[in-house]
């Protein structure tokens, strides 16, 4: 059954979100129209503002409305000589939530994937290389995901960074706190044994 053209357009637009199929999009549209039009208008306004005003930090490439994100603009953090390389802005939020890292970030906005046409240019590696060449970076922490693509990306960046004589480290991978060994996959378990620490 077809609805009004505007309702059909709303449902189709909601389907662009990850994990939202036709039924979920339809439920969302009905919820906004039937029960919460005020929230729908607020959502539309926030979405419109974000789409027109949010861009990328000129230093680290995370999302911001300004030229520099708050971390890069911070006198203390922005002048740190340690850069943590991550794949997405969501990774920055996850690390920041832990509260243990006090350096700068560099957001790749993806990972190397030649089959998908994603190479060094798409990841902004020329900008990262300029940061390394400036002489202001003493350590590069590679925090890409522990996937085949993430590992390949980390190795590519490590090779690039070695030319600039900076310390290169990789975040540890292993058994999660509170996890049970019987549920951990064999690759993670192998990484845990290889990366074990003395007590």
Curated annotation (Swiss-Prot):
Coiled coil: none annotated. CDD domains: TOPRIM_recR. Keywords: DNA damage, DNA recombination, DNA repair, Metal-binding, Zinc, Zinc-finger. GO terms for molecular function: DNA binding; zinc ion binding. Residues 81-176 form the Toprim domain. It holds the Pfam family RecR_HhH. InterPro entries: DNA_Rcmb_RecR, Rcmb_RecR, Rcmb_RecR_Znf, TOPRIM_dom, TOPRIM_RecR. A zinc finger (C4-type) spans 57-72. Gene3D superfamilies: 3.40.1360.10, 6.10.250.240, RecR Domain 1 (1.10.8.420). It comes from the Bacteria. Disulfide bonds: none annotated. One of its GO terms (biological process) is DNA recombination. May play a role in DNA repair. It seems to be involved in an RecBC-independent recombinational process of DNA repair. It may act with RecF and RecO. Belongs to the RecR family. This is Recombination protein RecR. It comes from Shewanella sp. (strain W3-18-1). The lineage of its organism: Bacteria, Pseudomonadati, Pseudomonadota, Gammaproteobacteria, Alteromonadales.
